[in-house]
Structures are given as C-alpha cells and as structure tokens.
Amino acid sequence: MESVSQLVSNCASRGIPAQQFLNFYHELINEKYGASLNAGNEERESESRKQVFEDVSRELVQAFHSSEDAILLAEYMVHLLFINYDTYLSSALLPQVYSIQSETLLMHFHSLAASFIGKLEDKLIKEQMRQDLSTFILSSCLQCDMSTFNNQLFISIVKYLQALLTLIDDSIDIEMDKDNLKLAVTSLLTRTTKLNRILGKRIGREFETKLNLSLSAKLAMVNSPQIFSPSSGATRFAGTPGSTKPMDLALSATSSTSNKIQDLKLIRFYKNLWLNNKIHHFNTSDSQLLEKFSSINSRLSSSLAEEHLIQEQITDLIETTYTSFAQLVNNKLYHQTNTNFNLLERKYVHFITKRLPLIIKDFLPQNPSVIVNSLQNIDEKVKKAIKSYYSNKNDSPERNEDLFDDYSGNNFDIRHDFLKNLIMLNLRPPSVLNEFLREDQMVDVKTLKTDDSLVIVNSQGVQEKVSDVQEALKSLIADLDIENQYVANGNNYRFSPDNALLKLLMSFDTIAPTKQVEIANAFLQILQKATDTSDLKTLGKVLWILTSNVGHSTTSMLCCISPGPFINAVVKFLEKQQRNSTVSSSDEPDFDSLHSYVTYGMALSFVVFLKTTYDFDIEPFIQNFEESYTLKFLSSIEDISDIFVLQNESAEGSKLYLQNWLRDLFINGSISDSQMKNTNVKDLINLIPFIFKQSVIAVQAGVVSNILNLTSGFEYFLQPFLMPGLIKIMFWLEYYLHSLKNNNPPSQILSSCWELINILICPPSLDDDAKGLHFMILKLNCVRLLNVLYLFRNDESNSSQYGVYAAHESIDPKLEAVISKLEYIASISNIYDVDTKCYETTKEVYSHGTLFSNKIPVTNEHPIDIIMTNQLNSFWNLHSSTYYNYDYLLELIKLITPEKFLVDSIRTLTYKVAAYGIPGVQGKLNTSAIEQVANFLAYFMILHDVQTEEQRLALLNYIESGVIVSKETETKQEPETKLDDDFDMLFGEPFNNTLDETSLVFSQNEQPKSYSSSVFPVLHDTFGVVIAEMKKRYDTSKNNGLLSEAAYENATTFIRKYVENLKNSVV
C-alpha cells in the first residue's frame, strides 16, 4: 500500500491541486489506519490517534524535505494543518515543521497560513484552534531558533503569529516556561521592529495583552547574540518597485504607508497592462497564467510579497479582469478615438466568459465562494461603467449584433454571460443569476443550460447531442461543399442557413467553454493531419472555414489555443508544396494537381488573414528565411515587380514563358495543355499580377485602343488554378489607385480601369471550385480598397451639376458595382477595428464616413500631438490605466515608431515633473518624482516589447552586453499545447538620434548584423533596442568625460528604470 510520503511526492510531481490531494489523503488514512482510528474505546482510540498521526507526521516531513515544488507543498501543508484541522495531526506535525530545510517552502507555508487564518470564518475550526493555541500551536513556533532564518521567512512567521493572536478573545497562558517565553518574544519583537517598526509595535501590543506579558522594559534592554542583525537585504521588504537603493531603517510610519500606496498603485497599473498584453496577444491559454499573475506582487514589490491561497489568487484575477474590462469599455464610451477598436474587446469577452470559468474549474472546482466574493467585491464604479456601456450598446440604432440576444431585455451585460458559462460547467446553480444580479433583471432559470453538452442541428432539423467532438467535426467537414454554401443573392455571397457546421459556428459564443476548447483542438488536429497527409480536399475546407471566421469562431478558437499551432501547420504545408509544385509530369494536366492550386491559394490567404486581422507574425515558423516563398510573398504582397523573372530560370527563358502565356490568354483564347503542364503555382502567383499591372498601366498610358482586347484574357484569371494570383492584385490595387487618383486621369481612362477591375471583383459567374477562394481573396483587403474607391466616387458625385440628389446617375456603374460588391463582402466578413458605417451598403446615400489607411485617424481634430499629450498626462498622473486602450496605443506606436514615442515621452515627462511635480502627491514620495513617473512608462514599454520569458532575457542580455542571444527553430507543435515562442523576428531598426538636447558627441552606430535563417532574434520594433543605443551613447559620453556623474544619472533615469524593471517583470 502506498505510504503518505509517496502520496505527497506523487501528487506534487503531477501538480495535483491541494483540495484533490486532501481527498486522496483522507482515502489513504481511512484505508490504512481506519481500524486504529476507530478502536471503540475512547481512551484507547485517543492513544491510537496520537501514535498514528506521529507516524503520519514523520512521513509528511520526510516528503516535504525531498520534494521540490515549494508553492504546491505549502498549499498541501496548509490544507492538512488548518483547512482540515485535526488536533492530533497538528500537535504532531507543527513542532516538526521547523526542521524542514527549505526556507522557500516555510515562507510560502507561513504566508498562506496567515492569510487563511485572517479570513477564517468557520466557527468550529476557530474554537478548536483557540483551545490548542496555549498547548502547542504558539509554543511550537516560539520555541524554534529563528536566528538562522532569512528576513523574508522571518517576517512571514511574524505575520503568521499575528494572525494566530487574533483568534484570542481575552488572554491565555501558554504552556511554556515564563522566562523562556519572554526571552523568545522579546527577541522576536526586537528583530521585527528593526525590519518593520509598525509591524513590531502592533504585534508587541498583541503579545502584551493576549499573553499577559510585560515587554516594554525588556525590549529596550535586550542585546542577545541570537538576534539577527539585519543586512541591506532586509530593506527589500519596504522598497519601491524598481528601486535598488536601500531603504532608511528609520523611515516613519507615514513614509512607510506612503511607499506601500505607491507600490499598490504601480502594481494595479502593471496588472492592468499585463492582462491587456496577455489577452491582446492570445496568450491566455497558458497553463501558468494564474501563477504568473499571482507573482506580480512579489516581483514588483517585496513589501507586498505575501503568499495567497489559490482562492485569493483567483479572486484577485477576477476582480482585476472586470476592472480592466470596465476601463476598456469606459474609454470606448467616452474617448471616441477608441470607439472603432473592437477586436480587443471581443478577446476580453472571451477571456471573461470562457477562460475565467475554465480557470475556476481547474483550480477550484469545489469552492464556489470565490465567485460569490468576487462578484460582491467588484467596485461600484466598475459595475456602473460596464452597465452604462452595454446599455448604450444595446440602445444604439446602428448595432448589428447582441452578445446576449437569447435574453429578451436590454439590462444584461458581460457579468450575466460569465455566470451563464459557470452554470454550464456546474460551478454555480442557475439561481445565481437572480441571486446576485437581481437589480438588473429577473431570469427564468428553466431556460438556462445546465451542462456543457454540445448539440448540433442536422440537415433534417433534428438536434443531436455530440459525444465525440472530433469525429463529429470530421463528418461535418466531409459533408461540406463550399460551392453550395453561397446562396444566390444577385452577384453577392451569402452563407447557407441550412448547413449544420455553419449553424454551429454561427452560435459559437453560446457553446460551453470546455466544448469550445475541444472544437478548437479538433480543428487543429484535422488541419495538421490534412497538411501531413496532403489531404487537399479536407485542408481546403478547413482553411475556408477558418478564414471566413463565421460567427467570430476563428477568433474564439485562437483565444482557446493561440494562433501558433495553426500557422505552424499551414506554413509547413506552403513550404513543402513550393518544393514540388509542378502541375503534372504526364501529357495532360491532372485534375487533383490543378485543384491543389486552389488549396495553395487558400493556405496563402489564411496566412495573410492572420497577419492582417490579428497582426500575427510567421517568422518564428520559417525554417529557411532565404528560400521561404511564404515569407517573400508576405513581405512583398503590396508590390508587383516591373520585371518578370522565373526562379531558377534565365532571362531569356522567363521572357519565352511570359510570351507563351500572353499568347494563350490574349490571342489564342485558350490555355494549352503543354503550358499547363510546364508551370507551377509560385510562378503563376507572380505571373498573373505582373500581367495585370502591365495591362492597367498600358490602359492608363493610352496604349490600348480597344479594351476588349484585354477583357477576354482577364476572365481567365478567375479560373481556379490561376486565382491565387489575385491576392497580390488586391493589395497592389490600393496603392495604384491612390497614385491614379493623384494624376487626375480623364474619365475614359478611369472607365477602362473600372471595367478591368470589375471583371476580377464582380464576375457574372464563377466556377464552383473558385467561389470559396474568390470570397477569401476579396475579404483580405476589401476595407482598404473601399477607402480609395470612395475617393473616386466622391469626386464623380461632386462633379454632378445636380448635386448629391442626382449623384448616383453620374457615377460610373462599373465603379459602383465594384464598391457595392466590396461593401457586401465587408459586411459579412467580421472585419475588426474599423467603423462599420464606412462600408454599410446603402441604396440612396453615397456620403460614407471617411476611412483611413491607418487604424488611427489623424485629423485636424485629433492630431498626433494631442493624442500623445493625453497619453503622457496619464503617465504623469500615475493613473492605474492608460488614457487610451492598449490596442489603440500599440497602433499609435506602430504609426510614429517606438523611438519617437520614447524620445517625446522622456522630454515631455521630464519637463512636466520638473515644472509641476506630480499632481496630488508632491512631497509624499520616498524617491524622486521623476523615478515614479519613469516606473510607469518603463513597465508600459516592457510589456510592449516582450511577451515571453525568453524574450525578456534576450532583450536584457542585449541591452547589458550588446550580444544577441538567438534560438534554434522549433517547429514541431503538439495539438493541445499553446505555442510559447510567439515572438517577433529581429532584423534591427536603425537608431536615428533625436535626443540631441546637449552638445554631446556620440559615437556612430555599429552596422546591423546579419542573421542566419535558423535563428530568431527578438528586438524588432522594440523600445529596448532604442534604450540600448541610448545607453551606449550616454556611457560613451561619460567615459570620455563629456558627462559628469550627476548629469549622467539625471540623463539616464528612464534608461535605468527600464533596465531595472525589465529584470523584475513578469511576462
């Protein structure tokens, strides 16, 4: 039979939660010692229990000595000794606790125990502990020699004792020699007072009143060699985040309180940013998310380095999430520049309604009180902000979706959806909605789903409960005919309302969190198998589903898993296909090989979709940068070369190849079999855009007299095997049309251009195999194309002599057809971060809102300097959140570059602090005001720069040593695991010195290094690389005597704070 020691070791090695371990422990004790613990005779039973638990305690201590996971073992100890309180076990185990060698384990144990006791409400456990305080609980701690303990462990023990003393109502007499007791308490108080005067005074009063001790005189006289003499390390417990200067031990209580307030403000700010960063970058599926979140307090401020029970950690996460979400939607409601950014909001909704319930289910399946406390503790301002936002959203006449449309009223918000998902996971009863949110609106609980089952509606309209998600999806995908999912709607697309798979995806938000994860993993596994086996039919269908993003299902699946594994599988397919992409070696082209061109186009479209929609980089998944066609395609997607050259072919061979294709397309009117046989998909993807560009330029130059000479050849571009070439055309067109608009061409030239474009975008008919790919390609850049097309329509409308009332008669019908088609595509494509009014189709009105090339509109009303001023005032005021939402700020930095953002921030904040101080906190800071402001800016920049621990260490190493640590490519990815190496590639950005406020002579930058294709440096477009260059220049100036020590310290405040905080950051 397994021993208690083995049970602890096995559970710890498997990461079994403490509550589940406790259940296993009870089973083992009952099975192994049941007969001894139930002897029948009360006296014999007491002796047996003592003996049993003495044996058990020895085994437990042995296990605690040998195991390594300190945090988990500390939770086991707290559950055994206090949550599952038993006098016999505690009396045997507590005296042995201090023989454990691991100070980390002891520190976590005492911190967790103090936290539990401080919040203990169980009257029975309280009464049992009160009875045992005088006999062994207090004495077991006070009798141990604490002189060898480090300061952090010592403080945790003091707080543990303080919590125990709060259980005493009057006073007690400890069963311990009176003199030894006084000496122990006096020694403890002396050391405590030196480390934390306030804590020492408070616990001193508790000892005097509750243990009947007179300590004041002895405390002043004591000078025992046993007392620890605190070193500079002791000051870590009251320092300011990011500060490495030792704290004056004589700080007043007022100063200490002020420091703690500063720490709390900065931690709230960092948690807000950290959560935004995780959600924005699809990193919430990380199994260590809760652990990393809970470590922020200790990493940023040792004065707040208390261990918390798992219940408290989840409560903090829930409350922080709701607060951050309230700030997000409040900004959208009142700062109009944020209004059109909706992707981060959707990710937040998924995290709150789907991911948080899963975290609760994983860590606290049997403890619903956490949810109750969290909902009750949400600040009233947070509730008000959320309710106001959803009320405004539901009442808006422009709204086109309702997250909670299964409810009949408008008083529901994200809190209700959070509870609905908890109910589906059986973590809360259905009555919880009316119990906690009754002030909003009552709900008929019978209508709520109370399990996480997945139900699909088959083709006969019958509901079926799915038992095997992966097999069900395989069957639905096999039955899916893409060409039949487009219901006739003029020349537009409309998804079929009768397909079971599309119905499931359209209602994806209503599916239980557990089943969403299963569906996401099933799609990933099907995709990976299809790419590995070259199952082109299945692969094409999956890629069409994912790129279509029906019901925002793709966004939700990426939140469940992260984009990494998906992009890895598709990139492997693209790179593999490019090496063997000739249509056929037989005399006639093979149909399956031609069909593979469509699949290849879908794969490219999916990669472009991830890049343009979610700004996800593919560099980490490329094995050979020099030879990767996928990477070259993405990097030049908006550019069509003026010279056509085949890869691995001479100029003469390329010329002959081009001539043959032009002859077949525009003269012969058909494509010969030999031409088809001797081509490949890469060549066609470059050939079709080249022909299109040269044709359009020829039309613009007036070289083509009869446009009909081109139209018949252009129609061939819509053949399935040629259609992948349209991807680059759709992106290049945006820039070409901007150029065309600036040249003011005559109307007949414009009419010819619209006719050629109309052929590709608005064909009267399409081959069935081409419908899906055609829709995907048009979707990729439709909004940006509309942006420039509206300029032409507005011009034509304004030129009408009858004004806007007759504008539709003067607009070229071919231009209007193109606009109408793209507007419709946009309206059914779930486009993010764009004002939907800009592409809503209308019949009579042509005055659409203005679109912009960037997501951030820069206008006379909202110039960059005002945008920057608003955000920098937020840093200056030490707000707990940013003025603009996180997604907006990332776009802003991308627009003006990290270097300019940093330099402008340093200049502005330095001036503001010097001239005005910090609003509301002047004279209350233990460190300089500029350092406090620098902390806020530094943490913002750090979370912009790094998303993984590997990135953090690489960036820190580069700043301090100038050496770039690279990592070998790892492309293999398990289906269920999240890709942790989601990091950017460094090509390095040149640093143009704009911080030229002094007459310093800086050394020239080193030339950027070249990198091999097998490594992934991590400094591209980061503040860190700018910081490194600035640091190097200031260091050089100081070493050359151009800067004094004081001037150097003053000039590098923001640099030092960035580096110091980068060392402590949780990512």
Curated annotation (Swiss-Prot):
Any one GO molecular-function label of the UniProt entry: transcription coregulator activity
InterPro entries for this protein: Mediator_Med5_fun
Domain of life: Eukaryota
4Fe-4S recorded as keyword: no
Bridged cysteine pairs (disulfide): none
Chief subcellular location: nucleus
Record's keyword terms, sorted: Activator, Nucleus, Transcription, Transcription regulation
PANTHER family linked to this entry: MEDIATOR OF RNA POLYMERASE II TRANSCRIPTION SUBUNIT 5
Function: Component of the Mediator complex, a coactivator involved in the regulated transcription of nearly all RNA polymerase II-dependent genes. Mediator functions as a bridge to convey information from gene-specific regulatory proteins to the basal RNA polymerase II transcription machinery. Mediator is recruited to promoters by direct interactions with regulatory proteins and serves as a scaffold for the assembly of a functional preinitiation complex with RNA polymerase II and the general transcription factors.
Complex formation: Component of the Mediator complex.
Family, per entry: Belongs to the Mediator complex subunit 5 family.
Name this protein carries in UniProt: Mediator of RNA polymerase II transcription subunit 5
Organism in which the protein naturally occurs: Kluyveromyces lactis (strain ATCC 8585 / CBS 2359 / DSM 70799 / NBRC 1267 / NRRL Y-1140 / WM37) (Yeast)
